[in-house]
């Protein structure tokens, strides 16, 4: 069984200090998608969440799957007072027939203005 890596972030002048990661890794029939943050960092939690979820869709598509195949999601937000606004966008985006197991936590982001980051695991049929 091979491991397929997509969207490998390498060190360059504009992202110096960031980790070298693969945003999407597929092993067997499971895809792991991480480091999904707003880029550029603009707007409120709703704007950033919508931007991040569009990127999730892009990465899932790249791996040959979609949000109906999500198994789990981990969400980090900058402040729990943003939880309801984040969820309003999440609930519009998620496949209501196939919601993943999900956790939402708060964190201090290292990038100024960043309000949300998402990591998901999905089946890859």
Named regions from a protein language model:
Residues 1-71, 77-125:
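N-terminal presequence-like segments and the immediate start of the first folded domain
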């Amino acid at each position: 069984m091979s491991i397929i890596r997509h969207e490998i972030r390498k060190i360059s002048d504009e992202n110096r200090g960031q980790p070298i990661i693969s945003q999407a890794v597929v092993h067997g029939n499971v895809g792991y998608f991480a480091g999904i943050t707003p880029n550029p960092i603009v707007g409120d939690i709703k704007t950033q969440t919508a931007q991040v979820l569009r990127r999730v869709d892009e990465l899932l598509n790249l791996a040959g799957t979609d949000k109906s195949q999500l198994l789990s999601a981990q969400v980090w937000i900058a402040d729990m007072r943003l939880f309801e606004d984040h969820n309003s966008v999440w609930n519009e985006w998620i496949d209501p027939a196939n919601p993943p197991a999900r956790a939402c936590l708060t964190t201090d982001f290292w990038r100024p203005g960043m309000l949300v980051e998402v990591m998901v695991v999905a089946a890859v049929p």
